[in-house]
Regions:
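Glycine-rich phosphate-binding loops at beta-strand->alpha-helix junctions
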Residues: 82-83, 258-277
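Conserved phosphate-binding catalytic cores of ATP/NTP-utilizing and phosphoryl-transfer enzymes
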Residues: 1, 104-130, 302
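Conserved phosphate-binding/catalytic loops in two-lobed NTP-binding clefts
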Residues: 103-104, 277-299
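Glycine-rich phosphate-binding loop and adjoining helix at the ATP-binding site
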Residues: 72-116
Length: 325
């Protein structure tokens, strides 16, 4: 079964054709990230205007010489203006082609980027699994009992891990490059100590708002913002965030006797995070770097394994779509 997938939740306009949930036949991404650089972050109005310009050319390129049996589209969460472009376009295609349409939760779909890795094959022995979705807007833990059944276990009570990376990058003068800039700069020249939030509480929740405050205080109390200080602060920020993510995930593994770990989302591209997970004694799966950030490929994979076709009239953009399942 071939699925045309459309993703427009933020600043990327993406379309892909996915076969049987595991094979990428095409994947096209039009990014407006460079345009947002001068603003120091994503401007919703600018993002939606770019989505409008890019959506049809992107879909046309993705479907060139390819047939598809159904349409999948991100309905949320995300920016309302951006979501509307993808949703209304998908509904129009469904109406014209008379093909089924499948609404997709963007956050949950990040997990299914793992199923698109050519090295991965779906085996029952890998379940139950713990899935960590970690991005600029979300930090969530799920229990997967098979390739389609998910149960929400916990998430951030304030800011996401990616938000902490992004704000730190801006503070250190790296613009909006976020976690990648922190990763490239991190080097322990001297000791900087930051708190590890909610590390030892009884829940599977996360909190990174206090960490952002602690980072700002550390920056303000050191007047000498030398290269060594910047690299040391970047190192500690990365250590704190990855320590907390791994600790909470492993706590979930122990609680639910999980057999494997899946991660997804933009922060899952962080090499230090991957290194720490690889040092655990449980099978660990992460997507190729190219599938960690927003794209339509994992939207199509999610739709194949977990999606349910609905009447196109009933689909609406849902910017505040909940992730608890």
């Amino acid at each position: 079964m071939n699925i045309l997938a459309i993703e427009s939740s933020c600043d990327e306009t993406a379309a892909a054709v996915i076969k049987d949930g595991t094979e990428i036949l095409s994947s096209i991404i039009a990014s407006s990230q460079a345009m947002h650089e001068k603003y120091g972050g994503i401007v919703p109005e600018v993002a939606s205007r770019e989505q409008l310009k890019c959506i049809l050319p992107t879909i046309t390129e993705a479907t060139k010489s390819l047939d598809y049996d159904a349409i999948a589209v991100t309905i949320g969460p995300g920016l309302i203006g951006s979501l509307l472009i993808g949703v209304e376009t998908a509904k129009t295609i469904a109406y014209v082609t008379k093909k089924p349409i499948i609404p997709v939760n963007h956050v949950l779909a990040h997990i299914y980027a793992n199923f698109l890795d050519s090295r991965f094959s779906i085996l029952d022995s890998r379940f139950p699994a713990i899935a960590l979705v970690v991005s600029g807007g979300h930090t969530e833990l799920f229990l997967m009992t098979n390739n389609k059944d998910l149960k929400w276990l916990g998430g951030t009570i304030d800011d996401a891990a990616g938000e902490a990376f992004d704000k730190t990058a801006r503070l250190l003068g790296f613009g909006s490059r976020g976690g990648l800039a922190i990763q490239e700069t991190a080097e322990k020249s001297f000791t900087v100590k930051l708190p590890r939030p909610l590390l030892h509480d009884d829940t599977l929740n996360f909190s990174f708002s206090g960490l952002k405050t602690a980072i700002m205080r550390e920056w303000q109390k050191n007047s000498d913002h030398s290269k060594k200080f910047v690299s040391s602060l970047a190192y500690e920020v990365q250590e704190v965030i990855t320590d907390v993510l791994v600790y909470k995930t492993m706590k979930a593994v122990e609680t639910y006797d999980a057999k494997s770990i899946f991660i997804g989302g933009g922060v899952s591209a962080n090499l230090r995070l991957r290194e720490k997970f690889q040092k655990t004694d449980i099978p660990f799966y992460c997507p190729p770097i190219s599938l960690c950030t927003d794209n339509a490929a994992y939207i199509g994979s999610y739709a194949f394994f977990r999606g349910h076709p609905v009447d196109w009239h009933s689909i609406e953009a849902a910017p505040n779509l909940i992730v608890e399942v």
